[in-house]
Amino acid sequence: MWNIFKNKSGQSHKVKDKFQLDLDNIPKHIAIIMDGNGRWAKERKLPRSLGHKAGVETIRDIVKECNNIGVRYLTLYAFSTENWKRPKEEINALMELLVNYLRKEVAELHQNNVVVNTIGDVSKLPKACEDELMKAYNKTKNNTGLVLNLALNYGGRDEIIRAIKLMYKDIEKKGLDIENVNEDLLKNYLYTKGMPDPDLIIRPSGEQRISNFLLWQCAYSEFWYSNIKWPDFKKHHLHKAIKDYQNRNRRFGGV
C-alpha cells in the first residue's frame, strides 16, 4: 500500500506503508532509547566503537522516515548522565561520532526542514561537540518540520532537580505564591518546555526499562520494546511500533 500525503512544509511524500498506518494518527512525539550498539558489535567480534558507528546509520534512516510520515518531534537518547562511567576511549569515540554526524548531516537536515535541538547539559561536553550543536541549532532553528531532539548528557532525575532549582529561584525573585506551584508551572522549566510529552517510547535490544529517560514526560507514554538491536533497527520496525501504538486505547487514567 502506498500513501501520498503532504507534511507540515507542504512537500509531497510517497511512503510504502506495509503496516497500513493511519496517517491521521501518527504519534506527535516519538522518543527512542537507542540501545544495543555495543552488544551488536560484540556479537560480530568488532570494537564497540564500530557498533556506535553502525548506529549512526540507523539514526539517519529513522530521522528521515519520521520526517516523511509526519512525526513532529523525535527525541533520541544519545548520551546519558550515567554514560560518563564508560571507558574513556569509548566516550571519546562517541563524541567524535557526534561531531562527524553533525558536520555531515546538518546541511541535508536543514534542506529537509528539520530542526536540530538538544536536551541535556551540553556545557559538560567537549567544546567541539558544543560548538557543532550550536551551529546546527542556529542553522535549523527557523525550520518548521520535524524537531530532532538529541538527548546529550541527559538524565531524567537531573532534569527534574534542575527544573526545581530554576523554579525556586523564580519563586524567590518574583514572589510567587507557593500554592500556585503546579505541574504546568514546573513543565516550563524542563528541557522540553513547549513540546508535547512523548506519545510513544521505543526501546530496541531486548532491555525493558526506562533508564532515567524523560521521567517526568513519560507518565502516559506508550512503550514498545523489541529484541532488535539499534544498528539493525529499520523503517519497518518503526512502522510496526507505530501500528501497535495505533491499535492501543490510550485512556490517560480514565476508562
Curated annotation (Swiss-Prot):
Record's keyword annotation contains Disulfide bond: no
Active site per database record: 35, 83 (proton acceptor)
Keywords: Magnesium, Metal-binding, Transferase
Pfam families in alphabetical order: Prenyltransf
Cofactor note: Binds 2 magnesium ions per subunit.
Entry keyword Metal-binding: yes
Gene Ontology biological-process annotations: polyprenol biosynthetic process
Swiss-Prot/TrEMBL cofactor(s): Mg(2+)
Superkingdom field: Bacteria
Binding-site residues, substrate: 36-40, 48, 52, 80-82, 84, 86, 203, 209-211
One MF annotation (Gene Ontology) recorded for this entry: ditrans,polycis-undecaprenyl-diphosphate synthase [(2E,6E)-farnesyl-diphosphate specific] activity
Gene Ontology, cellular component aspect: cytosol
EC number: 2.5.1.-
Binding site for Mg(2+): 35, 222
Quaternary state and interactors: Homodimer.
Similarity comment: Belongs to the UPP synthase family.
Main function: Catalyzes the condensation of isopentenyl diphosphate (IPP) with allylic pyrophosphates generating different type of terpenoids.
Listed NCBIfam families: PRK14830.1, uppS
Name this polypeptide is given: Isoprenyl transferase
Protein's organism: Clostridium tetani (strain Massachusetts / E88)
Lineage: Bacteria, Bacillati, Bacillota, Clostridia, Eubacteriales
